A protein has these predicted regions:
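Short, hydrophobic secondary-structure boundary micro-motifs
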Residues: 37, 109-115, 126-127, 178-179
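Short hydrophobic/aromatic patch on the recognition helix
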Residues: 46-56
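Alpha-helical DNA-contacting segments of helix-turn-helix folds
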Residues: 63-70, 118, 125-128
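Hydrophobic alpha-helical connector segments
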Residues: 65, 79-106, 182
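Secondary-structure edge/capping motif, primarily at the C-terminal ends of alpha-helices
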Residues: 78-85, 114-121, 170-174
């Protein structure tokens, strides 16, 4: 069943959809991925279970949509700021990486649930993955303004891959904390931009 795109919803539908996402995020923050059950989401959001399924095909689609909303907020926050602090492209990208890592670490239980969902092999989740990837690329491109286009695009692409792999490692217990994700990203950025 196809779900309506957020941009074609009425104001009241958009408000209900937002309440559903907020309820899912609260449950995920309280108990992680397994704590998010669609019936509980509906009850917390104050909507019928059918309403939840009208907007989201599955729990993974719901949580992936929540991560997408989080990423959109991050993009808006980063876009509202001036060029990140730092004299060099490396310093600026490390500043951005550390800000994003701190934002992720504020609610590690929630963020782990969102990352778990975004990896699901669900076509609806794939749409969220593509948009999150676009946002990550946009956010990482800003601090690299002024360097060679090919180097910037390659650096952004590789950092996005390292970020995703590091997040998977963190969620699956291969690394100790979400801060370790930031460490790996910083190391990769310094390697890729050596001499810039």
């Amino acid at each position: 069943m196809a779900t309506p795109a957020p941009e074609v919803l009425t104001r009241s539908q958009h408000a209900r959809r937002s309440r559903v996402i907020e309820a899912a995020m609260q449950l995920a923050g309280e108990g992680g991925y397994d704590a998010v059950q669609m019936r509980d989401v509906a009850a917390r959001a104050g909507v019928a279970l059918g309403t939840v399924y009208r907007y989201f095909n599955s729990k993974d689609h719901l949580l992936a949509s929540a991560l997408l909303e989080w990423a959109r907020g991050l993009e808006a926050n980063m876009g509202a700021r001036a060029m990140p602090a730092g004299e060099t492209p490396v310093d600026r990208i490390v500043s951005v990486i550390r800000r994003i890592t701190r934002a992720s670490a504020r609610d590690a239980t929630l963020f782990a649930a969102l990352v778990t969902a975004i990896t699901a092999p669900d076509p609806s989740v794939s749409e969220c993955q593509a948009e999150v990837q676009r946002i990550v690329a946009a956010v990482l491109s800003v601090p690299l303004h002024g360097i060679d286009d090919e180097l910037r695009e390659g650096t952004v692409r590789i950092l996005a891959h390292v970020w995703f792999a590091s997040l998977l490692g963190w969620v699956n217990g291969w690394t100790t904390s979400v801060n370790a994700v930031g460490d790996e990203l910083e190391f990769a950025a310094r390697l890729l931009l050596r001499g810039e």
